[in-house]
Amino acid sequence: MTMTDPMTTVRQYIDGFNRGDSTAMAAAFADPGWILDGIAPHVWHGPTASQDWYRDMLVKAEHPGASDLALTLGEPRHVDVAGDSAYVVVPATMTFEVHGKQVTQSGAVFTVALRKLIDGWRIAAWAWAKGIAQPHACSELFTTKTTYSVRSRRKPTRLLAEYRYSEN
């Protein structure tokens, strides 16, 4: 097996996503599998993790009217194969439409751990680190409220930072 074999499985998973084929996505996944993503409930685990995540992602996308979701992978930043384990870090871009406007989320990172089973490489776990969406047509998907706490000698100070992308 070559270093690119785990990437073949990663691409098969993404191709299944782009076709809206949760069965193909599940076929690339190990049992059990883990997913860590930015949408609630944030962690999925078990034999149906990829299908459960896909269902929850579609529900989240439906609320603001997002459609035509597609992922594009860049060239891997890191592929490490050690026996029957592999670790892949690849930049990714997500595109979708909201009310007829194209939205691109660039700068995302897709990190994947794989296991080599009898029938080939399978995804054991993946995590998605969100990028930046531009232009933005739906604040519901990418509004983030982050609270930072800074402590001084005398009293704690709290800063509430709110990031909103608005229609251009």
Outline where the language-model segments fall:
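A short local loop/turn or secondary-structure capping micro-motif enriched for an aromatic residue
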Residues: 44, 96-98, 131-135
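Short beta-strand edge/turn micro-motifs at domain boundaries
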Residues: 87, 106-140
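Short beta-strand segments enriched in hydrophobic/aromatic residues
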Residues: 29-30, 92-94, 127-130
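Short, low-complexity N-terminal intrinsically disordered segments enriched in polar/charged residues
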Residues: 1-31, 48, 122, 142-168
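Generic short beta-strand segments
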Residues: 55, 90-97
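A solvent-exposed, acidic/Ser-Thr-rich amphipathic alpha-helical stretch
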Residues: 4, 22-84
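Hydrophobic/aromatic beta-strand elements that line small-molecule binding cavities or substrate pockets
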Residues: 50, 73-79, 92-94, 108-115
